[in-house]
Amino acid sequence: MGSRLHVQVIHGGPPLPYKDDIRAFGKEYAEQLDAQDPLRRFRDEFIIPSKKDLKRKTLFPNDGMYSCGHPICFANTSCACVHAAETEETSDEKCIYLCGNSLGLQPRSTRKYIDHYLRTWATKGVTGHFVPHDDQLLPPFVDVDEAGAKLMAPIVGALKSEVAVMGTLTANLHLLMASFYRPTPERNKIIIEGKAFPSDHYAVESQIRHHNLDPKDAMVLIEPEDLDRPILDTKYILRVIDENAHSTALILLPAIQFYTGQYFDIQRITAHAQSKGILVGWDCAHAAGNVDLRLHDWNVDFAAWCTYKYLNAGPGGMAALFVHERHGRVDIEQAASGKEAFHPRFSGWWGGDKQTRFLMNNHFVPQQGAAGFQLSNPSVLDMNAVVASLELFNQTSMAEIRKKSLNLTGYLEHLLLRDPQTENSEKRPFSIITPSNPAERGAQLSIRLQPGLLDRVLESLNEDAVIIDERKPDVIRVAPAPLYNTYAEVWRFAQLFHLACDKALCGRK
């Protein structure tokens, strides 16, 4: 495992509460864990889809009418019908939603934030950019990016100046690589994993081609040594780095691998690569809001992530990036004299110094830090959705979220592998390809089914209103989110999953 100061070392701490306790396989035990959960109040801050919601063919019940007969209208959120409908909805049986690694659930406050934005735009027009209001949830439009950065920074272990909430994930990776990938005849390779998320692969490949290089020569793929165990051991990654050290300019790896759920040793890999003169970037899409990151302390050069997974900002929500403070410094005196004063980057007006931004003098001096990498003014609509969720995260800490996540996912693993009826691995129709060491994974468990079972298992789970994620041909990804998932849900999922496997096996015979 190496020297991993950034994770809770399970084996060195007290035993998890469900170990060696036969009661752990009962519903009452799971409910007891929920009663003792210090984060349990956060579940009420999210809208959990009901079984009726999932099966309904329309977005609104009663053909767009409330049960009172009034038409649904979200423009008037003070209408008694709206609140009555919300009260009625909570009485429906909720689905089991274990898919926060794909799309997080909607915070209840999201609508309030967006309503405030719409009202500001409607009643203030362009003055909404600059005029503060006593009842505002966010500052005027011109300053919303600062509000997002302030809330995001502690979630990824960064200084506020090192974070910018902006753009989309792949676009941000391109911007960062345009700045940090500076190939020379001697050093022009980029090292990535062989099974990287396709968009990352495409981005790296196109960056190499952009510099008139051939990916066959300049792209190093770290492939799993054992296809039956698609995990990249840290020592193996370091060996690949050593083998290519003198010809490599950049490394881009995922903090957490999207398919296996493996949590890479960011601190160790970063330090090792940098000791060889290589810049290191991380795709934190599956890590932000999931594990307790320390991007500043680990000396990461740059990172990027989306906000629609564990950060619950909605489909395609605004992304974010990190640039370590040593790369974000701007020498104002040098810039004033026209000399090179900051790290090279693609530039846009919103990244310019706020004091001179509106002078329109075509002399670009970036803001200090990651803010200087911004291009255009951010979508205030999207920023409100981001901030609505980040406010919840800032009511606790990533250390507390990670602590519950370790227990919650560990409990799920325990129920799947240690159930007396399925403990015999030879008879079990599935295996878990995610690392068994809790320090080497996030919330997600990737479960590989025997060939031919996936569709039948998914059909059964769908009938029971269980929402998880699939990866063809035979893997499901299950990710309990600590802010809104419960131990009782995990227990119920394990029961339904075992039943689904039994049905699938019977159907195959």
Curated annotation (Swiss-Prot):
GO CC annotation terms, alphabetical: cytoplasm
EC number assigned by the record: 3.7.1.3
Reactions this protein catalyses: L-kynurenine + H2O = anthranilate + L-alanine + H(+); 3-hydroxy-L-kynurenine + H2O = 3-hydroxyanthranilate + L-alanine + H(+)
Chain residues that bind pyridoxal 5'-phosphate: 169-170, 197-200, 283, 286, 308, 349, 377
Cited InterPro entries: Kynureninase, PyrdxlP-dep_Trfase, PyrdxlP-dep_Trfase_major, PyrdxlP-dep_Trfase_small
One annotated GO molecular function: pyridoxal phosphate binding
Named cofactor requirement(s): pyridoxal 5'-phosphate
GO BP term (any one): quinolinate biosynthetic process
UniProt keywords, alphabetically: Cytoplasm, Hydrolase, Pyridine nucleotide biosynthesis, Pyridoxal phosphate
Biological or metabolic pathway of the protein: Amino-acid degradation; L-kynurenine degradation; L-alanine and anthranilate from L-kynurenine: step 1/1; Cofactor biosynthesis; NAD(+) biosynthesis; quinolinate from L-kynurenine: step 2/3
Cell compartments where the protein resides: Cytoplasm
EC main group: hydrolase
Keyword Cytoplasm: yes
Modification N6-(pyridoxal phosphate)lysine occurs at: 309
HAMAP family, per database record: Kynureninase (MF_01970)
Family: Belongs to the kynureninase family.
Family matches, as NCBIfam families: kynureninase (TIGR01814)
Main function: Catalyzes the cleavage of L-kynurenine (L-Kyn) and L-3-hydroxykynurenine (L-3OHKyn) into anthranilic acid (AA) and 3-hydroxyanthranilic acid (3-OHAA), respectively.
Subunit-level organization: Homodimer.
Name used for this protein in its record: Kynureninase 1
